[in-house]
Amino acid sequence: MSSAGVLTCIPDSGPIFRETSLRPPVPGQETNNFKPEKFTMDSQHLKHKEDFNREAEGCVAHDSRFSRWGRSLNLLLDDQDGATLFRMYLEGEGLGDLLTFWFACNGFRAMDPLEPKTSKTAKAIYRWYVQNSSAVSGRLKPTTRTQVKECVKNHQLNKTVFDQAQQEIQRAMEQEAFTSFLQSDICKEYARGVEDSPTPESPGPGLPTLTEDEEFGGLHHFSSGMGKINRAFSRIPPRNQRSHFRKLEQTYQYFAPAASINDSEISSDALTEDSMSMTDGSVDGIPPYRSKKQREIHRSVSANGKVSLPFVPRTMRPPAEMMPTSPAEFAAKLTIALEKVKKQRDAEEKLEEKLQRLKEEEEIADYDIPSSSHETVPGAALEDDPQSILDDHVSRVLKTPANLSPRSQSPFVQRKGKFQPAFSKGQTSTSCHLRPKVPQGMEATSTLASELRSSVSSQLPRSSRKPEGCTQPHRPEEGTSAAVLTTPLSPEQEAERNHSVLQWVLDSAKLMKKHHRETASVTPCPELKKATHRAASQPAHLFLQDTSMPPLTAPNTLDQLEEARRRLVEDKRVPKLHKSRCVQSTTLKEKGKTAESVPSSGFSTLKLSEEQKTAKKPSSECPGQGLAIVYYFCGERIPYMIRTKEPSLTLQEFKELLSKKGSNKYYFKKESHEFECNAVFQEVSEEDAVLPLFEEKIICKVERAC
């Protein structure tokens, strides 16, 4: 076969082969007499080909998809849009579980039966759809449900476990929902939107032709055409509409060359910066820096074009609270708000008044009950009170079994309205003095009672307060407890109290007359012991003997607990051995210097003699007792006192003795002749510094550091 024959048989039809062009010869028949026949097609075939070419170019027929959907349910579910629309339709009808179960069966069929997830998936499908879904279980046959249940329960799993159930559900969907879906509004709206949407490759209508020397009259037709386009755009989704709108804008744009603009300005004698002078190197009126600036703009847009800016609406609606209302509604709302504010302020004022009242009551209570009630009281003084001292005195002086007042066996506590002084340390010796003669009559009895009271009050410690009838409180001296301030009694209460005391004294005087005993000399100590023993044999409570004498009030439990706690703290602070030695030495001295033994109360009936005052020394001056340390903690009125065997202390050793630790400042009292008081408080901050002494004691003020 020669190539020349092939070339002669193929006509020169150009680079494109068309159906109307001559066909090449059959291979092997190139040398035969060949008559080229022109291939002709009928009009119907040509029309079909034209439709085919139009579809190949992008104009796809819109009804082809719906025709496929209408053939079978499987074709509908194979299409993504069709499955989505069908799911929406079933969910609207309350049958969404049917389609979900159908897809779950497809997914289970694709799984491997040997995998561990397969059994879990089968159980989940059975539990969620076959067992609990009424839409699925109601359309399955009982035998099918039983078969699936046994397979899942016995772990007889294979790919065909749910095939029978899937076929029954598919048959139910075809009979109940498939036909109605094709005729539903959802399907029709989707078809209408696809038909009305133009293809992406379709060009715009373009500008109408304007003939010269004629007036344009086709504006109406052009506007009607644009109306159709706008209506078509309204049915297109926003994404497609945005893309088509950009293409239409590009179609309608018209660019005039810069040269023609420049020529028109020159011909019209319009002088601008570009047309006035061309010596700056610009071409056609475009400045040379314009291109560089344009490139920079494009770079910035490409770099920052995806920055999301906040959406700011053009119109901002005011909130509902800002909307204008009628004066009546506004007045009602304002009244309610003001009433709430007024109630709140009234409640705050009442609360402030209550707090102020409580504060005043606390201040009054602090004034009535000072902190001196917690002062250390010796053990001997805790067993007696002024009334017991008076009873002992009368029994010794009158030598009669007088009716005794009740004695307080509890620790000393402070009671309002009762005569109870606070006792101090250092006075433990007593002596016997001459007894006065007993007067006659009521006036003499009252005189005797007043003398007894004055004698008892003179022998009490300096720290004891006066009876409640006095107006001026007793000032405590150095080394004694503070005075206890109480409110005075009313005149009726004072008169009743005096009457009870006088009646009791008269009864004692009558008993004395019956015994006919003379009182002329000083009673020796053995006789005093007998008298006290005889007095102690009487009942402790006066109301058992004399109903006219009112009983004492019960002691306060809180005060007793506070005193016990304070004593425990003091016992822990001071070494027990040192304390016992000091007490023992004091008792030995008193026994050696006093010829008469004293009762356990430790108080005398009359004034101490000058010899005993000089012979007895305070317990603080006993030799070998150590150094006394007195300190005030953070502004407290009552000081704390501890003792140590060391002759001197440093600041570090002093801090170890304190029960309260923390960041504090320490000021120690020392002698100084720079001031009139000859004393000054000096701050000591160094740990190794030796503490100064004042009157053979260490006196310190402990303050909180700021």
Swiss-Prot record:
Could you list this entry's UniProt keywords, alphabetically sorted: Cytoplasm, Cytoplasmic vesicle, Developmental protein, Wnt signaling pathway
**Subunit and partners:** Interacts with dvl2/dsh via DIX domains in both proteins. Forms a complex with ctnnb1/beta-catenin and gsk3b. Also forms heterodimers with mouse Axin1.
Outline the segment boundaries, as ranges, of region: Disordered: 278-298, 400-482, 585-605
Residue stretches making up the RGS domain: 72-191
From the UniProt record, list the coiled-coil ranges.
none
Q: Where is the DIX domain?
A: 624-706
Gene source species: Xenopus laevis
Q: Where in the cell is it found?
A: Cytoplasm; Cytoplasmic vesicle
Q: Does the keyword Electron transport apply?
A: no
Q: Provide ranges: composition bias, Polar residues.
A: 402-412
Keyword NAD set for record = no
Give a short account of what the protein does.
Regulates the wnt signaling pathway by interacting with dvl2/dsh, which displaces gsk3b from the axnr-gsk3b complex and thus prevents degradation of ctnnb1/beta-catenin.
The UniProt regions of compositional bias labelled Low complexity, in chain numbering, are 453-462
Q: What Gene3D superfamilies does the annotation carry?
A: 1.10.196.10, 2.40.240.130, Regulator of G-protein Signalling 4, domain 2 (1.10.167.10)
Q: What are the GO MF terms of this UniProt record?
A: beta-catenin binding; I-SMAD binding; molecular adaptor activity; protein kinase binding; ubiquitin protein ligase binding
Major subcellular site: cytoplasm
GO CC entries: beta-catenin destruction complex; cytoplasmic vesicle; nucleus; plasma membrane
What is the designated name of this protein?
A: Axin-related protein
Q: Where is the signal peptide?
A: none
According to its UniProt entry, the protein's GO biological process terms are: cell development; negative regulation of canonical Wnt signaling pathway; positive regulation of proteasomal ubiquitin-dependent protein catabolic process; regulation of centromeric sister chromatid cohesion; regulation of Wnt signaling pathway; Wnt signaling pathway
